Amino acid sequence: MGELTSVEICAGAGGQALGLEQAGFRHQAAVEIDADACGTLRSNRGSEWKIIEDDVANVDGHAFHQVDLLAGGVPCPPFSIAGKQLGAGDDRDLFPQALRLVAEIAPRAVLLENVRGLGTRRFESYRCQVLARLRGLGYETWWDLVHASEHGVPQLRPRFVLVAVRQPWAGWFRWPEPLPGPAPTVGATLHDLMAAGGWPGAAAWSQRAGTIAPTIVGGSKKHGGPDLGPTRARAAWRRLGVDGLGIADDIPGPDFPAGQLPKLTVRMVARLQGFPDSWVIAGRKTAAYRQVGNAFPPPVARSLGTAIAAALCRGNVSPAAADVAHHASLA
């Protein structure tokens, strides 16, 4: 089988797209409406991915008929615990557009991620409608809650993930196993960045920040400047030795006041999300933080993409036929 192809919708800063690329998928297109996020995508993969700066509602899926994978992080406000949870009644709900594209593209597999709020009982009827539509299009479907910390990301970040695969490949799909051992800590992940400016408190800070981070919250354009979330989240950051009331322009230097908690920079937040340091984030600080904070961690996308790729690369042999062949070889 040749290389696997994909289309990414609601691509944002490219976290999911990057992880899927690392899993072996070549993106035929990355669709994103936000200008700053498109700047990020072009800065990093402008010569390799077709960047479509447009509303996903305007994208004709027939142009990408039968790519291997349709993936995306559809907007979460309709289902977010922090929001009003309007679900299908929210005009920001892009699941209908995603399902339209599934019908037009007819990919072999689908990967859509959202906040864990979508997995609550309140939205059970909505989930059933989505699954019924996908099954009507010939897909086997799975929902699961995936924790970023189980895939090498120093952050809790539970996400509700939908995977749909057509036969005969569906029988081969297995959810990725958590990585062995504990997740890296915030201190271990960021120590070199905190120390790079000569801050003498970096080593002690790293020891204090000896656990994973709470879920990073990117927020929306309706809110003001960037910060690390609501009161409860900021309290969790404070226990890690981080001032969550804003995002820093620069790393702490040698004259950083003793007893004062440092703030994270956008680059630090990107690293906590699993982005490589080489990944350029376009836009001013608030826009850059919003992109990073709302991203799907690349390592999680890589794990999911690897699992999907493994199923798709089994060819046209069904699991049942493979079992028959295996038992015949032992006879």
Sequence positions of predicted segments:
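C-terminal target-recognition/interaction regions appended to catalytic cores
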Residues: 195-331
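Conserved acidic E/D residue at the C-terminus of a beta-strand in Rossmann-like folds
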Residues: 31-34, 113-114
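A short, Lys/Arg-enriched amphipathic alpha-helix followed by its capping loop at the start of a domain
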Residues: 19-26, 44
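Short alpha-helix immediately C-terminal to the canonical SAM-binding loop
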Residues: 35-39
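Conserved SAM-binding strand-loop segment of SAM-dependent methyltransferases
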Residues: 48-55
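Class I SAM-dependent methyltransferase "Motif I" SAM/SAH-binding loop
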Residues: 9-13
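Class I S-adenosyl-L-methionine
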Residues: 59-69, 77-239, 318
